[in-house]
Amino acid sequence: MNLVYIITIIAFFSIGFELVFLHVPSVASVYQLCIKRASISTYLSKPLEKGILQHTINWPFGKKLLFIIIPTGISIITGLFPLICSISVLFYNRYYFEPLPVFNAIGCILIILGRTFTIFATLDIRKKNNQEGDSFMLKQQGFFKISRNPLLLGMYVMYTGMALLFFNYAFYIGLIIYFSNMHYRLLVEEDFLQQLFGEAYKQYKASTNRYL
């Protein structure tokens, strides 16, 4: 049983390491959409076209607060539930729940697969592009031949595994908000990539699915 909590803690530790040391730029981040929004057009050689990206950038701050900042905050807070519970069980012997036994193996496998997929896809894109700062490239090989968004797909798989192991209504509501929020921001990112890479990205979309 302790293996469930150990795997969960390692998964969150790897997320922290990834965020600090393996930064991958995104125009759909909270920082870019809500704070540094004026710089997004500088990545393009032409003015922003009408679409979900321009529409979202032009939202008033109140709407961004309601539909971007607050959902992101809720996702982060509720998303930490498995980590907090795992630490409490392993280090303080406090049992708030018991993972569903029938889902233990499946949940652990999904967590490991999800993190592995995200980490190796991140290393792949950074190795090919040697990304520093906010640079962008159209990656179509390796993990990106399987999915247009392998980093996010890996996070979805990981959290699905945790949902099988950690029963909590607030956590589940947070996951729904997280999936919805990230999917919308993914549409924003795709609009940007379509404008940045043009026909090349259109062909990539035709040959590779958004997730799987």
PLM feature segments, named:
Residues M1-M137, M158-F192, L196-L212:
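Membrane-anchoring alpha-helices and their flanking helix-loop junctions
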